[in-house]
Amino acid sequence: MAKIVILFDFDRTLIDGDSDNWVVTEMGLTEIFHQLRFTLPWNRLMDRMMMELQSQGRSIDDIKSCLKKMPIDSHIIEAIKSAKSSGCDLKIVSDANQFFIEKILEHHDLVDCFSEIYTNPTSLDDNGNLRILPYHSDALPPHSCNLCPSNLCKGLVMDHLRASSSNDQIPRRFIYLGDGGGDFCPTLKLRECDFVMPRTNYPLWKKISDNPLLIKAEVKEWSSAEEQQRILLQLVSTITKEEDS
């Protein structure tokens, strides 16, 4: 039987909204965010927003409280727990950040469902302030992918996962769920036995629609949390039956 690995993007896929935008809006940073929007790469812009919160006297507990209000649709929660209980290996590959993702998942009792989270790391500085760092450290040579932002190439993450499973006695089959342009690079790494689930009318879906001959995986689009749940669990069931037969 193949091991089913499910890779979730986070923003606008696992959650319906965007965790960065949620914090910016809920914590009153909209004005300064738009002032700086096109002066910094997104990852560094969000780090700058954390410094702005510090200057306003906001604490890390204030950020935690904000993140706890971020909803996750009940259909997604049910899908995650069902896939986990079915023996799937669930991972997150996201251009959000470690702190935001973990606090949202913890609040919804989901963090233990995921074996790994590949995202931009976070740390606390000497003053106890949250800092957001790039996944691909500035200390390392830049990746050469022109499809992805400089701070995170999801295709390299997929290469790592593929390489780490090369000696497995049990083959892996991947299901990749995403919405953004940054999800196109890992989609190109999927094989004929894998599946990609793009969100309808979002950038990943549009890139796949414009470049169908580049995609080896079977495409299963979704447009709502309920549809995502239904299709994902159907795929898990189908793969399991195929491998058991």
Swiss-Prot record:
One of its GO terms (biological process) is protein tetramerization. Transmembrane segments: none annotated. InterPro entries: HAD-like_sf (IPR036412), HAD_hydro_PyrdxlP_Pase-like (IPR006384), HAD_sf (IPR023214), Pase_PHOSPHO-typ (IPR016965). Its EC number is 3.1.3.100. Keywords: Hydrolase, Magnesium, Metal-binding. Its cofactor is Mg(2+). Disruption phenotype: No visible phenotype. GO terms for molecular function: inorganic diphosphate phosphatase activity; metal ion binding; phosphoethanolamine phosphatase activity; thiamine phosphate phosphatase activity. Monomer. This is Thiamine phosphate phosphatase-like protein.
